[in-house]
Amino acid sequence: MLEEWILKKKEIESSKDRLNGADLCYAKLMEAELSDANLEEADLTAAYLIRADLSGANLSGADLTQAVLSEANLSGADMNEAELTDTFLNGANLQGVLNLTCDQIELANFDKDTIFPSYIRIKWSNDRICECVDGN
């Protein structure tokens, strides 16, 4: 089972330029190297992308519902109209992410370790309640 998972992950990594529209639901892509990947309109519902490198990736229109992106590097990724309902962004690096809105963020799960782009500010009133302010 582990060997099968590793082979599938390597296959996905090697075709990262051609993943637009791909069905990657429930994919196990922990620590995957997907920098600059074309994941436009990809279905990543409930995918495990813990500590994955998605820097510079095109995630426009991608469905990340319930995906786990804890500690993932999304710096410089394009998240235009990406679906983030119940997405886990705890500790994720979103610095320099393009086209991310408060409407998207408010649907996701994140914590004080999540790094947001400079145009997004999170105002915490306590550990669980916050307000997102979009500077765009």
Regions found by a protein language model. Give the residues of each.
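Tandem repeat scaffolds
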Residues: 1-136
